Each structure stands twice: as structure tokens, then as C-alpha cells.
Amino acid sequence: MLFLASLAAVTEAEKTSPLRCGHFGASGLSERHLSCGDFAGVLSTWDLERLATPVWQAQAHGGIINAMDAMGGARRGYGAPEIVTGGRDGRVCVRDPRQHDAPVAAFEPPEGLEAVPDCWTVAFGDSHCDGDRSVLAGYDNGDVKLFDLRNGQVRWERNLKNGVCAAEFDRRDIAMNKCAVATLEGKFHVFDMRTHNKERGGYAGVEEKFPTGATLWGCTHLPQNRDLWMVGGGDGTVSLYKYAYPDQRRATDADGKEYGVTGEVRCLTYRQLSTQPINCWDWSADKEGLAVCGSFDQSVRVVICSRLSRQ
């Protein structure tokens, strides 16, 4: 069941360039610096108690910064604090906030393209030791790419035939398990990231169609249960889905090579929250079922989803 709650603004600040995305993930629990990307391609970090000037800023992209993810600031898990951004210029850039003048990794769009695809979403994952971390990126032309930060190269890519609005690993601080990818025209995909088979297109995946066909703006996994995630729809609905693993997650083909086997996806519940798209959703890491979401109706809503531990 879904319940609505209310909240009040604590502080406000207006900036010259509109802000497109933001994240606390590269900040420590004590300082709580907010990293933001704007329409001018500037990446900046703000102290919420001193909003007059940024702590630091850098020109990260040649156009709008469409998406951002960050991790490592809370000193939990593995790896340095890092911020990854995806922009209209098609670039994916990774920055360490401690040395922010230049990216520690940058993945450029292929040369010779008539039109450079926008990068619409980025997500960290596979951060299971100090030496490993990957980035999952989705583009407006339907491409989804997995970048290996250790080797600085594309580890896997696939075209889903619809613009990729959101992508997320079920857990980013473990060896890759599975990921969810949401696209235009009401489709989302779940890929099993444990077994790679090049001849079969890389990782096995299952595709689901949203009943209304509305654009899916986000897919956010529950921190307390990686097999549950919320999907935000362009029709103003949110839907809670569950993934059921198969009896065996891998099989062997006639050549003796292993390939992944996908499970099943089912919708547990849904709720109409707005008449406008639900474009962002974030779960509380401390309180199971507590979440906040944003919508194109310029409203921010606090939501409580109950009985999740029984699913």
C-alpha cells in the first residue's frame, strides 16, 4: 500500500543557470555537500549552509548535464569518492571531487557520427573492491553501455531501440548482479549481469511492457531488498515490481560456453500520484518504504510504501 505525506522547504537559493540534476553520494555524512549539474554544462558542489558560492565548480560538458550519479563519500564500501555525469554532448565523465580540475575518466562518443546521441542516464556499479568500478550509461538512440573504469573501455553494449531514460544496478557496492533499464514507449529491461556470453549478445535480459505504454522515467531499487524496485511513469503513476530468479541462473550451450538465464518480473502494486510524469524517485536507506519523488507538476512528494518486508 502507498500513503502520501507532506514536507516543508528549509532553505532556497536561485542560480543563474537552471539545475538539471544533483547528488549527495560523493559527500561525507558530516559535511553533506550537494553536487549539481546545470544547463550550461557546469558541475558544481554546494555547501547547503553557504549557498552564495559553490565549494568548487568545473566545466564538465559542452551542453546540458542530463544525469549524475555519485558514490564513495560516506566511506562505506570500496573505492574513492567519485561523480559521474552524462551530457547532451554524448560524453560520460568521472570526477574525483578531491581533484576536480580534470576528469579521472572520460568516454567520448564515437567519431564520424552525423548526430551525437545524448547521454540521458548514468549509474555506478560493480564497486566490490578498491580496484573495480563500472558505469552504466543510457542514450537517446537506445544504446546502453557498460564502461569498465579499471581498463577504461566499453565492457558491453546493446541497442534497445528506444531512448534509455534510466538505468540502475540493484546494488552498486557488490559484484554486478543485475540491472534495470527504463526506456521510452513504456518498456523496461532487467539484465542478469553475472554471466556474459558474447555470441548471445552479452548479458541475458527480460523485457516488460508498461500497461499504458507511457514513457518510464526511472527505476529505483529498494535498498533493503534488491529484488524490488519502483518505476516512475509518464502518466503520473508509480509501480512496484519484483524480480523472481530462475532455478538456475546460468546454463551451458552446445559449445560448452555458459550463458545467463533470466527470471520473471511481476507488478506488485501501483498508484496514481499525479497527472504529470514522475521523473525521479529516491528511497530512504534508513526507513524501509519511505521515499521522496518529484513530478513535472512541480511538486515534491513524500511517500510511504508499506508491507515491503512481506514481499
What are these regions (language model features)?
Residues 153:
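Short, small-residue-enriched loops and turns at beta-alpha junctions
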Residues 200-203:
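Short acidic alpha-helical/loop segments enriched in Asp/Glu that coordinate divalent cations
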Residues 196:
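Active-site/pore-lining binding-face segments in mid-to-C-terminal subdomains
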Residues 258-266:
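Intrinsically disordered, low-complexity acidic Ser/Thr-rich regulatory segments
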Residues 1, 254, 258-259:
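Blade/loop signatures of beta-propeller domains
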Residues 1-147, 156-174, 178-191, 206-224, ...:
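WD40 beta-propeller repeat fold
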